[in-house]
């Protein structure tokens, strides 16, 4: 469940497979990440392979914004009524929303997966790209971080939308919570050679992680 929750807060999505008029609503879960995160895709696949019929597939596509040919990896689960129930909580009118009861399901592991999906590291702060959520939903996320993890976040403008930032002091708290749950290939999300805290957090392991990632 942590993989589903963390991914749905991030880049993952549920695709509704039936409207539920004469039968239960069904949905399937789709994972799609770029080539740099190939290992992360396969890690998610291993966590969910009892729901999946095919291994992750490679796809090549043209990115008009960057005028480049991109490579990415994806897989999806089989459709099920159980995922249809989760769809009901995470979607409204076909759009992803922040469930009212998200505080019951967020924990350090699902938070780490959310960060692996949407987190970034500037060397002096962390941000979570929460652009898909409304401003009111992001205010609820700020409250969630404060009440459940004791972390103070800030909503910052990012062009026409908003995201959540964690400045000096707070990002250290966040790193301590999520680092035990990060997979090795995603440690670059918190390890930065310009950031002395990385070495304190990961000790002698930090140089190895930087080489591996």
Predicted features, each with a name:
Residues 1-213:
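Internal intein/HINT superfamily modules and their associated LAGLIDADG
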């Amino acid at each position: 469940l942590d993989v589903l929750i963390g991914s749905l807060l991030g880049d993952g999505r549920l695709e509704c497979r039936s409207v539920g008029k004469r039968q239960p609503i069904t949905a399937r879960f789709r994972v799609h990440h770029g080539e740099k995160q190939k290992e992360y895709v396969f890690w998610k696949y291993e966590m969910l392979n009892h729901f999946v019929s095919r291994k992750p597939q490679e796809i090549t596509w043209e990115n008009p914004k960057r005028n480049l040919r991109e490579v990415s990896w994806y897989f999806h689960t089989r459709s099920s009524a159980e995922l249809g129930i989760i769809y009901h909580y995470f979607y409204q009118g076909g759009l992803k929303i922040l469930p009212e009861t998200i505080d019951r399901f967020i924990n350090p592991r699902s938070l780490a997966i959310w960060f692996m999906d949407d987190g970034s590291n500037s060397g002096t702060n962390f941000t979570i790209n929460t652009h898909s959520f409304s401003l009111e939903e992001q205010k609820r996320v700020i409250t969630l971080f404060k009440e459940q993890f004791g972390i103070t976040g800030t909503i910052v403008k990012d062009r026409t939308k908003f995201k959540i930032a964690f400045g000096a002091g707070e990002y250290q708290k966040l790193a301590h919570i999520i680092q035990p749950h990060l997979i090795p290939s995603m440690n670059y999300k918190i390890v930065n050679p310009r950031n002395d805290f990385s070495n304190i957090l990961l000790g002698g392991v930090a140089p190895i992680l930087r080489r591996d990632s």
